[in-house]
Amino acid sequence: MESKFEFAKELVKKAGQYILDHMQEDLQVETKTSPTDLVTRLDKEVQELLVSEILSRYPEDKICAEEGCLRASVQEGKVWVIDPIDGTNNFVAQQEDFAVMMAYFENGQGQFGLIYDVVKGDCYHGGGAFPVCLNDKPLAPFKAKPLGDFLIAGNSGMLETNEWGLADLSRAVLGVRVYGSAAISFAKILSGRLLTYVTYLQPWDYAAASILGESLGYRVVTLSGETPDFQTRQPVMMVPLEMQEEIQSYIYERKRT
C-alpha cells in the first residue's frame, strides 16, 4: 500500500502541473446539466491523464470518475475515485480555489485520500494507515469549542431557502462561507478553519475527504445522519463526531421552507 500511496501523491501533483501548464490556453468551456455546471477541456484531459496513469500501473483496478461513464462501485474490489478539477467554476472565473481529488478504496474500505490545491501547491494526503498531512506537516485532530466560535461552509441556495435548516444553523455559528469548491471547503475543515460543510455532492466530491477526515475525528454523513451511498448525488455534510449530534439538531430532517 505504501508504494500505491506514494504513486498517488506523485500523480496528483503531475495532474496539477498539467493544469498550470495549460490553464492560459483556450479552455473550451461547455455546460453539462445547467448554465452553472461547467466542464472544460482540461477537466477531460486531466481525468484522461489520471485514469491512464492508474490503469497502466494497476490494470486490474477500477475507476469512478466525474467525467464520462466510469462509475465503479467502491464496495467491490480496488477502486479509485477521481475528481479531475473540483471547483471548475472557480477555475474558469478566477483560476484559483480549485483542486484535484483522488481517493482509493478496497472492498468499501477507504485506504487513503488526496486533495491537491493546485495554485497554492497544498496537498492534503493520508488516511487509513497513513497520517493525515498538509504537505509534510501532520494535521491535528479536531478540537471542540463552543458552536458559536466556529465558521461553517455551505451551499448558497440552501442557505437562502433554509433548506435542511442551513440558515438556522448559520445563525447559531460565527458565520458562513461559500467557497464554490468541495475540495477547498473540506481542506479548511481538515486544517481546523471550518466546523462543517453542508451541501449536495456526488461521490467524487466527498470520497477523499471521507477518508482523510476519519483519521482526524470527522465523518461524512448524509443530512439525515446516514453513511452516503457513494453512488448518487446526496445532501451531505462533513462533521466532527463529537459535535455531530449538536449540529444535526439544527438540520436533521429539516426540509426546504
What spans do the regions from the language model cover?
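N-terminal subdomain of lithium-sensitive/metallo-dependent phosphomonoesterases centered on the IMPase/IPPase/PAP
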Residues: 1-85
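A short, compositionally biased
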Residues: 25, 98, 126-130, 214, ...
